[in-house]
Amino acid sequence: MTPRRTPLSQLEQGIPFEQRHIGPDAEAQAKMLAQVGYGSLDELTAAAVPDVIKSAEALNLPSARTEAEVLAELRSLADRNQVLAPMIGLGYYGTFTPPVILRNVMENPAWYTAYTPYQPEISQGRLEALLNFQTMVAELTGLPTSGASLLDEGTAAAEAMALSRRVGKVKKGVFLVDADTLPQTVAVIETRAEPTGVEVVVADLSDGIPAEIAERGVFGVLLQYPGASGAVRAIEPVIEQAHELGAIVTVAADLLALTLLTSPGALGADIAVGTTQRFGVPMGFGGPHAGFMAVREKFARSLPGRLVGVSVDADGNKAYRLALQTREQHIRREKATSNICTAQVLLAVMAGMYAVYHGPDGLRTIARRTHRFAAILADGLRSAGVDVVHGAFFDTLTVRVPGKAAGIVAEARERGVNLRLVDADHVSIACDETTTRSQISAVWAAFGAEGDIEALDAAVADALPEGLLRSDDILTHPVFHQHRSETAMLRYLRKLADRDYALDRGMIPLGSCTMKLNATAEMESITWPEFGALHPFAPADQAQGFLTLIRELEERLAEVTGYDAVSIQPNAGSQGEFAGLLAVRAYHRANGDDQRTVCLIPSSAHGTNAASAVMAGMKVVVVKTADDGEVDIADLRAKIEQHRDELAVLMITYPSTHGVFEEHVAEICGEVHDAGGQVYVDGANLNALVGLAKPGKFGGDVSHLNLHKTFCIPHGGGGPGVGPVGVRAHLAPYLPNHPLQPAAGPETGVGPISAAPWGSAGILPISWAYVRLMGGEGLKRATQVAVLAANYIAKRLEPHFPILYNGPAGLVAHECIVDLRPISKATGVSIDDVAKRLIDYGFHSPTMSFPVAGTLMIEPTESEDLAELDRFCDTMIAIRAEIEKVASGEWSADDNPLSNAPHTAAALGGDWEHGYSREEAVFPAGVSAADKYWPPVRRIDGAFGDRNLVCSCPPLDAYDD
């Protein structure tokens, strides 16, 4: 019999990408469905998802395309961008990413698929890299304690304003910003200040703080160093004057300039902020980049964001961990120091490694070359009669050309260079690591000047004041001197990566975190220079490909969520929350309802919800959670009635943080609307809804999404992320905008949330590609398989562990909660013991003690195949059997594989005095010696690290293996 001939059209399609993204194949799905008692995915989700929220129609999205087709489309979009020499400045500069860092960090899934290092024993490589970053920032700024990254320079400055108000002695008065500060930073500060009643005053501080401002009281001062105009001036007198007024002083500093200039700490600053973008991180049309903040020691315990510290493990060996977590949003909620959750870990690692790679001498060489080009450029312009405004500068010139500025900028553009049009009479020109002689000549030609670079190089003097030159050594730690050769650097990066656990090793079943596949085809384009080398303030006609991609992504996200408008500017989920709440606030105020400031939040909500609400000027009122995991309807109704006239918004997560589809969500939304409030649906769990239900259609007025969860941007070990905000039409006028790019948002918007007009635009091609690869039907099936996987795990584990919550049909959504409290009470085995024992079996722990203390929240996602799901279930069942050995007395309660977990290879050497064997410790059932992941340290003493806070690199002898 002749086999059936396959048509060419079918052969051309190949294997659909959907089958690459979704882990379980059709046969595996059938087995899983049988386990949970359903015949098809449609039957399962029909039973799990409440009828009242179901979408009647399929997603109206372009049909799925192959990887080759999508990459070709991306290439076509990239080709529509024009990358000119980026001499605009304003905090964004051309930089050269060392290929060893590009290939082995930015393009390496061992780095970019990891999660925030809440499990420090399996995050030691990443934590060491972040400690390098903190040490680099601390040494260059001259301040002893640096955090592990913030979102960008603008938000770092806004966080500094909040910190100044929180820790300073002056509790009232104004926040004073020098007029020569980056304009986007000023705008972000003003956006952040207004809801909390902080008055921001922008003034020229070149001659000190004006008396009329000093008389009003000043709680904080921000100085740019060097200034946005490029000016380098002595800021120490202003710092001294501010301190006399009791103000906290923040200096927004350029790290490359600080290799040559006196540090902010040496000048007396209390806080330093900025961006590390020019340390090897592509501009990416605005991001992502790692912002930074460093502070005096007395403010360390009030820092926003993550802070890596040095502690010890159970054997007394040096180990790293996240320090002082009790000040963060996931614990302190509305009392947190900040709403920052996702930061910019991957980019911080890159920037820190850039300093490791170049060392102090290499960085100074780059700085001197950049400055030399600026000085040569200035002398050439002066020789042609052009007025260079400032005599002292580092890399940026401002020149006065009355009435000619626009023409000069246009002429430079014709010659392949982008300059900054300051106003009709002034042009600004910034040099950077990538500046070339030909670019200098092109700029001269645009001004009608010419020069001899060799002759000027021999004659030109530095334009940095002698009194402001740095005299102390920088980057003195051995880590910045040991890895000069690429061989050494490559091996260092490999050594650190091998210490960590990321998705390239195995499943990371963190509930509410959606650790799904980050496909290589989705990632590939972000390193293309047509996307990566584009300046965020480049003219719109040079960014047509990027702007088209952004518009299409916003439209497709609106279709997925059921909203009318989407802004992708927020560069983290927390910032999307803030943007959405600001839109709600602005809407109420536009209607004359200024008194509507109460934000109702269920007790089970993400910690960022409450922290963001406080930042948006709202009063948080907590709503109880019922025993079944849903919002307590009676308590909610009572709170609505109690605050009817002041109700601004209800924030709910859907499906709930308890992993269930709440049946009453539409009813809840209706009652809030009847009381005059808005409904904010937190999109953290959108992976359970895509293609099945739309928040904007079942009662939501506003939601943020997490592109680093649902839409495949990798978590990067703690960032980057993107938190777009979607709104219904009545809130659309109040989305974020930007003063330097009018197209970035509505004229009536609330101001910028992020420093860049389109936030972390450089990683948006990832989500664009995911949606394009999957199509509407593929996205729906991904959701259905995610729900199937969670229910499969729940069914397999239910005979061994209590499953805390489920819906009316006995089903969970995309995650399930395993309750360890009865087991812990009966046996003394803690949730920490189980989490650390999972490491011995080769797993990252699920989410611990959220939203309920003493539980594990498991989210497998659609990307894990059946073999991995079964390996996890088998492991949990094996651990349950180990717990029984403790309960029965076979193993001592204080000496067993759980209480001593994790076990390192080093622990196997020497005497073994435990009541269980070495094999039981490190090769429990199902663990292969050939594939074993060995944690580099034993259980870490968190309390020791917080009591003895050390947040920079230990001395060299501490690195001995």
UniProtKB/Swiss-Prot annotation:
**Swiss-Prot/TrEMBL GO biological process terms:** biosynthetic process; glycine decarboxylation via glycine cleavage system
Catalysed conversion reaction: N(6)-[(R)-lipoyl]-L-lysyl-[glycine-cleavage complex H protein] + glycine + H(+) = N(6)-[(R)-S(8)-aminomethyldihydrolipoyl]-L-lysyl-[glycine-cleavage complex H protein] + CO2
User: What Pfam families does the record tag this protein with?
Assistant: GcvP2_C, GDC-P
User: What EC numbers are recorded for this enzyme?
Assistant: 1.4.4.2
What is a single cellular component term in the Gene Ontology annotation? glycine cleavage complex
Report whether Oxidoreductase shows up as a keyword of the record.
yes
List required co-factors. Answer: pyridoxal 5'-phosphate
Q: Is the keyword Oxidoreductase in the record? A: yes
Keyword vocabulary terms for this entry? Oxidoreductase, Pyridoxal phosphate
List the molecular function annotations (GO) for this entry: glycine binding; glycine dehydrogenase (decarboxylating) activity; pyridoxal phosphate binding
Per the record, residues carrying N6-(pyridoxal phosphate)lysine are: 709
* Description of how the protein assembles with itself and partners: The glycine cleavage system is composed of four proteins: P, T, L and H.
Q: Which family does it belong to?
A: Belongs to the GcvP family.
The record's function comment reads: The glycine cleavage system catalyzes the degradation of glycine. The P protein binds the alpha-amino group of glycine through its pyridoxal phosphate cofactor; CO(2) is released and the remaining methylamine moiety is then transferred to the lipoamide cofactor of the H protein.
Q: What HAMAP family does the record point to?
A: GcvP
What is the recorded name of this protein? Glycine dehydrogenase (decarboxylating)
Species = Streptomyces griseus subsp. griseus (strain JCM 4626 / CBS 651.72 / NBRC 13350 / KCC S-0626 / ISP 5235)
Higher taxonomy: Bacteria, Bacillati, Actinomycetota, Actinomycetes, Kitasatosporales
